[in-house]
């Protein structure tokens, strides 16, 4: 327990910030998992693209709030985009051969 008034206040502030950051982090992790799951189960391309747009939005908001670094957000978006692009190309190649 802190002995100094300002240290006690910092503890309270850190608790609030930790909970806020945790909710933002949970949100972008869940959206990312939804996107990867949609790719895994061969979801419709429209649904996958919608989830990708949502992922972009959530990651950008997390970076804006300082929960993750902007380069980390950019890197995650890039990797998700590459996976979606590969999925869509494989899906279109599969339907073209049928």
Swiss-Prot record:
The keyword Phosphoprotein does not apply. It comes from the Bacteria. One of its GO terms (biological process) is translation. Keywords: Ribonucleoprotein, Ribosomal protein, RNA-binding, rRNA-binding. GO terms for cellular component: cytosol; small ribosomal subunit. GO terms for molecular function: small ribosomal subunit rRNA binding; structural constituent of ribosome. Binds directly to 16S ribosomal RNA. Belongs to the bacterial ribosomal protein bS20 family. This is Small ribosomal subunit protein bS20. It comes from Kosmotoga olearia (strain ATCC BAA-1733 / DSM 21960 / TBF 19.5.1). The gene is rpsT.
